[in-house]
């Protein structure tokens, strides 16, 4: 798979293009008198060094771009790479099956767990089918149905957050979008089973929170979590989406800032260049964090889980 480079990665893209060009020449004519292997090796080392330098000093807007990267792993990618025996469950038993939310039972190191997550699309048709990862009320009601099923069978719940926000269409509002989100917030705070939430890409406002109330909340290194998109904030404050980079910095949407505010528990490091550069390595790190979180939560009684979750929620807003 050829990498899709972002604007701030263009110096890296130029080096990678040179490497690809030299490699192609070498493959076309193996009888060339010149040995280009050393040059390719040198350029690859230079590319890694340059990537380290660029990624060591990323701003909030650049991280927001990475969180939206079209090649970034989605929920179903992590399900495939980190879990076994996934059986997808569909429908809210009231209206429809919202493809922007996926969920089902799987095994994590042999242990049954309930997985729920946002799912964006890659190709145009899939993006439309998944509504670009923006759930309607039936998606959140499906998520709640699966959470209640997990509680009934005493299975831990693992959620993956990756949405620009809940779908704001007229139909969604008519079917009770705000009520569906509010009900999920309430019911998740009352769950009697361990619940682990991880932001894997965009954590967009109430659309993210509706599956984001848990005993542990993690973020991938280059994910974001915010009440509004940087473009939306800029449009309100400065009447121009061009001010999005300024808004991103001011809003504190990145993982280190949110951990500093005690809104999340852990930051999961990403491979050099972002999760899309090495999905397998990213999935391994994510799996290790989930197993560690489950080990921490397994020793707690149901009452302790609920009390800790309540105290966590009540602490929000205090420095």
UniProtKB/Swiss-Prot annotation:
Instruction: Report the leader peptide range.
Output: none
| Classification via SUPFAM superfamilies | ClpP/crotonase
Membrane-spanning parts: none
Which GO terms of the molecular function aspect are on file?
acetyl-CoA carboxylase activity; ATP binding; carboxyl- or carbamoyltransferase activity
Pfam families for the chain? ACCA (PF03255)
Major location (coarse) = cytoplasm
Disulfide bonds listed in the record: none
Enzyme class comes to transferase
Q: In which pathway does it act?
A: Lipid metabolism; malonyl-CoA biosynthesis; malonyl-CoA from acetyl-CoA: step 1/1
Question: Where is this protein found?
Answer: Cytoplasm
Q: Which UniProt keywords apply?
A: ATP-binding, Cytoplasm, Fatty acid biosynthesis, Fatty acid metabolism, Lipid biosynthesis, Lipid metabolism, Nucleotide-binding, Transferase
Which GO annotations describe the biological process of this protein?
Answer: fatty acid biosynthetic process; malonyl-CoA biosynthetic process
Q: Which reaction does it catalyse?
A: N(6)-carboxybiotinyl-L-lysyl-[protein] + acetyl-CoA = N(6)-biotinyl-L-lysyl-[protein] + malonyl-CoA
Q: What are the EC numbers?
A: 2.1.3.15
Domain CoA carboxyltransferase C-terminal stretches: 35-296
Entry-linked InterPro entries: Acetyl_CoA_COase_a_su (IPR001095), ClpP/crotonase-like_dom_sf (IPR029045), COA_CT_C (IPR011763)
Q: According to its record, what are the GO cellular component terms?
A: acetyl-CoA carboxylase complex
Q: How does it assemble?
A: Acetyl-CoA carboxylase is a heterohexamer composed of biotin carboxyl carrier protein (AccB), biotin carboxylase (AccC) and two subunits each of ACCase subunit alpha (AccA) and ACCase subunit beta (AccD).
Q: What does this protein do?
A: Component of the acetyl coenzyme A carboxylase (ACC) complex. First, biotin carboxylase catalyzes the carboxylation of biotin on its carrier protein (BCCP) and then the CO(2) group is transferred by the carboxyltransferase to acetyl-CoA to form malonyl-CoA.
* NCBIfam families listed in its UniProt record: accA, AccA_sub, PRK05724.1
Name assigned to this protein:
Acetyl-coenzyme A carboxylase carboxyl transferase subunit alpha
């Amino acid at each position: 798979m050829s990498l899709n480079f972002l604007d701030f990665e263009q110096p890296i893209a130029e080096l990678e293009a040179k490497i690809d060009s030299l490699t192609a020449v070498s493959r076309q004519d193996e009888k060339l008198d010149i040995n280009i292997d050393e040059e390719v090796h040198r350029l690859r080392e230079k590319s890694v060094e340059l990537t380290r330098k660029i990624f060591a000093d990323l701003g909030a807007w650049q991280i927001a771009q990475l969180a939206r990267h079209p090649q970034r792993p989605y929920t179903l990618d992590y399900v495939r790479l980190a879990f076994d025996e996934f059986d997808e469950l569909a429908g809210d038993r009231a209206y429809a099956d919202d493809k922007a939310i996926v969920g089902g039972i799987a095994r994590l190191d042999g242990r049954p767990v309930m997985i729920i997550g946002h799912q964006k699309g890659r190709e145009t048709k899939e993006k439309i089918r998944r509504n670009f990862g923006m759930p309607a009320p039936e998606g959140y009601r499906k998520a709640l149905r699966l959470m209640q099923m997990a509680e009934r069978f005493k299975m831990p719940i693992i959620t993956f957050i990756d949405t620009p926000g809940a779908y704001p269409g007229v139909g969604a509002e008519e079917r009770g979008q705000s009520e569906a989100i509010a009900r999920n917030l309430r019911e998740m705070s009352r769950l009697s089973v361990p619940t682990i939430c991880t932001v894997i890409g965009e954590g967009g406002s109430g659309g993210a929170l509706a599956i984001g109330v848990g005993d542990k909340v993690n973020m991938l290194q280059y994910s974001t979590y915010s009440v509004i998109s940087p473009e939306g904030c800029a449009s309100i404050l400065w009447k121009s989406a061009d001010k999005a980079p300024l808004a991103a910095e001011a809003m504190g949407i990145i993982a280190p800032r949110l951990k500093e505010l005690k809104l999340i528990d852990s930051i999961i490091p990403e491979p050099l260049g972002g999760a899309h550069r090495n999905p397998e390595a990213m999935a391994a790190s994510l799996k290790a964090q989930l197993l560690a979180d489950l080990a921490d939560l397994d020793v707690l009684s149901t009452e302790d889980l609920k009390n800790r979750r309540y105290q966590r929620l009540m602490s929000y807003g205090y420095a």
